C-alpha cells in the first residue's frame, strides 16, 4: 500500500507542476486592487529563492526597489513586509489587535502542546488569560524583586570562580551563560539543573524550530516533511520534553506541603491551578508549555555587552 502511494505521488508530481505553471501564466480574473508592490515570483516557491543568502539583507535590498510596504509570497503564503519604524508602530501598537493572531505551524504545535503557551498561542480568550496570569503573578515588580537574592547568590558564585582561576585563562562568555541559566533555572524551576539533563532536548527543539518546513509554506506538500522525518523527530522530542517537565511538576507537587518562603514559577502556576484564583482553568498542559518556553531561554546566548564591560572593568 505504501509503495502504491509513493508511486502515485511521484507520478502525479509532473502533472501538478504543469498545472502550477499554467496557473502562473493565466492568473485568476479576480481583482487585486490596493495590494502593495510585489516582486515577480516563481511558481510553487513564490519569492523564497530571493531570501538567500540572508533574509534581512534580501528584504532590505527589495525594500529599496519596491518601497517600505511590499507583498511577497513564501510558497503559497502571502506575506506583507513593513520596512519602516512608522509601519512597525502601526502594526505593533496602533492596530495591534488586528495583527495579533499567529498562524498555527505543525512542528511548533507538536513541540508546544498545540501552542498551549503564551509565545505561540493564537490570539483569543486563552491567550488573554495566560497573559494576565503572567503579568499579574509571574512578572510583577514585586515578584521580580523577590528573586534579588537568587541573582546575588549566583553572581557571588561566578565572582568566586573568577577569583579561584587566578591568572588562568577563563571563558567569560561561558561563565555569563552559566550565571544566566542558573538564575532562570532557580527562579522558574526552583533549583539548578545540569545542562546535560536538558541540553539534548533543548538543542533538538531549537534545531527543529529553525528548520525549513515545506508544509508551512506549501500546505498541500506537507507530506514531504513526514518523508524527511521532521514529524517523527518532533514527536520524539515532544515525548522527551514531556517526561522532563512532568518530573519537574511531580517534584514540586511533593514539596507543596512544606513551607516555601520564595516560590518559583512552577509553584505559582500550580497554586493558581489548585486554587482557581483567577477564574480561568489553567490546565496542566498549559503549565508544561510555559515551563518549556522558559527552558528554551537557557539556550539563548548571553548579551555580548556583558562580558565586554566585565573585561574592561
Can you name each region flagged by the protein language model?
Residues 1-5, 13, 36, 155, ...:
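Cytochrome P450 proximal C-terminal region
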Residues 31-48, 57-150, 171, 176-185, ...:
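Cytochrome P450 substrate-recognition site 1
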Residues 48-67, 243, 251, 310-313:
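Conserved cytochrome P450 K-helix E-x-x-R motif and the immediately C-terminal K′/meander segment
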Residues 51, 123-126, 261, 283:
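Residue-level signature of the cytosolic catalytic core of signaling kinases
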Residues 84, 140, 297-298, 306-310:
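Short loop-to-helix capping motifs
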Amino acid at each position: 500500500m505504501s509503495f502504491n502511494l509513493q508511486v502515485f505521488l511521484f507520478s502525479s508530481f509532473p502533472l501538478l507542476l504543469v498545472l502550477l505553471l499554467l496557473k502562473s501564466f493565466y492568473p485568476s480574473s479576480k481583482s487585486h486592487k490596493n495590494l502593495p508592490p510585489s516582486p515577480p515570483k516563481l511558481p510553487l516557491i513564490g519569492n523564497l529563492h530571493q531570501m538567500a543568502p540572508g533574509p534581512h539583507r534580501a528584504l532590505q535590498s527589495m525594500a529599496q526597489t519596491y518601497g517600505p510596504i511590499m507583498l511577497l509570497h513564501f510558497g503559497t503564503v502571502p506575506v506583507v513586509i513593513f520596512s519602516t519604524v512608522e509601519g512597525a508602530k502601526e502594526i505593533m501598537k496602533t492596530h495591534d489587535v488586528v495583527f495579533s493572531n499567529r498562524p498555527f505551524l505543525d512542528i511548533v504545535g507538536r513541540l508546544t502542546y498545540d501552542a498551549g503557551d503564551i509565545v505561540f498561542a493564537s490570539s483569543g480568550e486563552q491567550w488573554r488569560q495566560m497573559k494576565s496570569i503572567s503579568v499579574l503573578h509571574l512578572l510583577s515588580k514585586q515578584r521580580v524583586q523577590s528573586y534579588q537574592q537568587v541573582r546575588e547568590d549566583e553572581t557571588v558564585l561566578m565572582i568566586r570562580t573568577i577569583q579561584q582561576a587566578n591568572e588562568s585563562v577563563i571563558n567569560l562568555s561561558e561563565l555569563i551563560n552559566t550565571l544566566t541559566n542558573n538564575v532562570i533555572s532557580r527562579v522558574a524551576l526552583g533549583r539548578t539543573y545540569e545542562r546535560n539533563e536538558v541540553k539534548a532536548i533543548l538543542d533538538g527543539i531549537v534545531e527543529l524550530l529553525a528548520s525549513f518546513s515545506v508544509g508551512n509554506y506549501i500546505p498541500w506538500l506537507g507530506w514531504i516533511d513526514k518523508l524527511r522525518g521532521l514529524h517523527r523527530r518532533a514527536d520524539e522530542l515532544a515525548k522527551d520534553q514531556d517526561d522532563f517537565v512532568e518530573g519537574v511538576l511531580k517534584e514540586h507537587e511533593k514539596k507543596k506541603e512544606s513551607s516555601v518562603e520564595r516560590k518559583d514559577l512552577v509553584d505559582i502556576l500550580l497554586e493558581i491551578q489548585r486554587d482557581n484564583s483567577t477564574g480561568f482553568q489553567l490546565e496542566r498542559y498549559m503549565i508544561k508549555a510555559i515551563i518549556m518556553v522558559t527552558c528554551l531561554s537557557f539556550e539563548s546566548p548571553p548579551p555580548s555587552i556583558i562580558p565586554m564591560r566585565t573585561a574592561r572593568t
